[in-house]
Amino acid sequence: MNRKWVAFFSQTGSEIVEVSKLLGRWPDLIITNERPEHLRKIHPALEGKVAFVENKPTEEELGLILGHYKDPLVTLHGWLRIMPPYICNRFEIYNGHPGLITEYPELKGKDPQQKAFDLGLDFSGCVIHKVTEGVDEGEILRSRKVSIKGLEIGELFHILHSISVSLWVDFLKN
């Protein structure tokens, strides 16, 4: 990947760390939103590599940051904010989603792992999709299905995290 890469996260950033190590390349810019200390535990490998934006960044703030790069590839890794329509239309943005929304549209939105577990689904998976104005509505570019029957919630999170990392590596290499 020769393009500038900007990665966003709201949680720990562990997915970005794993993807970067497997690719042998770090994003050109890693962004997270300000959150109260008790809600935040950033992966130690990201210390000093992260730029902070407001907890609920504005369209102007996001546009100013992304506008520093010509045609950046923007990836969302547990970014718990909705990108404004103008940003979705101006930049090429992709989101990793830990719910097999190709088969289970009810897994769109927040906490798809918990939803899959609570629904007692036999299968789930992960997708990478283009970010559009609608939440988890964009074109799906990668997906992988896995059996989750009988898994504990912690196992489910772990398996879907591993699948997501694998999908991102494949997507970003190609």
Segments from the language model and where they lie:
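One-carbon transfer enzymes
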Residues: 1-174
